[in-house]
């Protein structure tokens, strides 16, 4: 679980086969092949704000590399710093878990989330200063295919440093 609807393009080079997953543009992630989020989500300062607020203690950067697996690698750079290799984990995708909780007991309820085998995590630094922060995530799959995505958020303060 954790892949949006999509299809595969199969590339052949003599006897070599390279599959490439393409998400349908109608999904929540459009045609992105990576979903980047914070878990737990930021404590938002405004109900209609997007990625502006405070980090909670133990916040992780979580990346879902759609159709990824243990033979792939995911790296992240925070604010132009050195690239850090993320840890591969089999776990429930927090994005799907949030949708499940949001729509529970409604006509649009989601099925109970299952663990995803294409999740990578990185513990967020607990010393990030207030202000804008930019994360660049890069992945390389087992076939050498490369993906790049970004995530920007604004810290008004950092609750993680208050513990």
Task: Locate predicted features.
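Short, solvent-exposed beta-strand-terminating loops
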Residues: 84-90
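Short, intrinsically disordered/low-complexity patches at protein termini
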Residues: 42-44, 97, 108, 158-159
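Binuclear metal-dependent phosphoesterase catalytic core
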Residues: 1-68, 72-75, 123-129, 134-154
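Flexible, low-complexity linkers/stalks enriched in Thr/Pro that connect modular domains
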Residues: 152-163
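Short, surface-exposed, polar/charged, turn-prone segments marking secondary-structure boundaries
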Residues: 38-39, 91-92, 103-105, 163
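Aromatic sugar-binding surface patches on proteins
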Residues: 93-123
